[in-house]
């Protein structure tokens, strides 16, 4: 009988936890948004937040106060990343996004935690609006890679700037050997 009561209590607790967790379609106040390495982009009247997460987490908001989850950039880990970065499981880090030459360019980190087995990837989309018929992320693969016992730097945490001549530049780095 004790096992039945314990099992019932455990099931009830799990159900309550599931019911109280935010659903992907629910609106979440900004004070409840928990994320790592966020970057914002605005298209039209909508802000889009990209962050570290499985497939690159994406959220949207009209007012920066109320957010909703969108589908991740990648439903599955990019094959090039799985093949290139041993230990990478689709948890993609520190995205950065710019709008340049009519496309949104998203740069992201694929890494094995605690190692400099890493690479920075690049994807583009003509729009950030998931309801647009033009919405489609195109992955362009690896931009740069770091390899243990070869490189004394780590290819993670990309940041893109565009200079006064319209030329994009990337910097990246970590505690391995600073910014490159």
What are these regions (language model features)?
Residues 1-23:
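Bacterial Sec-dependent N-terminal signal peptides
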Residues 18-180:
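Carbohydrate-active catalytic/glycan-binding domains of CAZyme proteins
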